Amino acid sequence: DVQAVSRDTRRFSSADGFNLAASGDNTAASAVLRALGRNILTYDPPEHGDFKRILMPAFMPARLRILEDRIRTFVAELLKSLDGRTEVEFVSEVASAVPIRALCELLGVPAEDEPKILAWTNRMVGAEDPDMSVNIIEAQQAFLEVFAYGKWLVEKRRTEPRDDLMSLIAHGTLAGEPLSDATRDGMCA
């Protein structure tokens, strides 16, 4: 069923973009929708494949082995830092630290910025969690902040490329031409 839907872009197109719940202040929702613009999630084949090819080097086996080694090292160091402790706040000290590190490694986010990424992430998903006191407006604002950060990081990678996803976006091309600012921005969303 999933394969059939993914191949039937006439009836199940991604081109309509996102239907963002705009409870509360519609201004924030409108800003988020403008920031999302056209991005890899809103393209159908064959355009979707063109964007996917830009990002694929980050997901090749050799690159993923490097990422895996870095994450294993991080987890080993993290567990060593907890050794001998009688109590651990598992969610904040382990369960959230590991995926944020993996995401930041993949994207190329400097380690010193990981706390910001975690805070934005918690605010973005917190509106859906009854245990967190985040409203939809705060979640939308967090999205705009992380989007601005992503645009900043891509711009930085244009002059300081590294072996990361944001550098692939910064230097990506379509049909032999550099990505437009709007396209790069959409890929940050």
Predicted feature residues:
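Active-site substrate-recognition loop segments, prototypically the cytochrome P450 B′-helix/B-C loop
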Residues: D1-V91, I100-L118, N122-M132, I136-Q141, ...
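Short, well-structured alpha-helical segments
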Residues: R72-V75, L118, M166-S167, D181-C188
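Central I-helix of cytochrome P450 enzymes
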Residues: S96, I100-E105, V146, T173-A189
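Cytochrome P450 catalytic core segment centered on helix I
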Residues: A119-D181
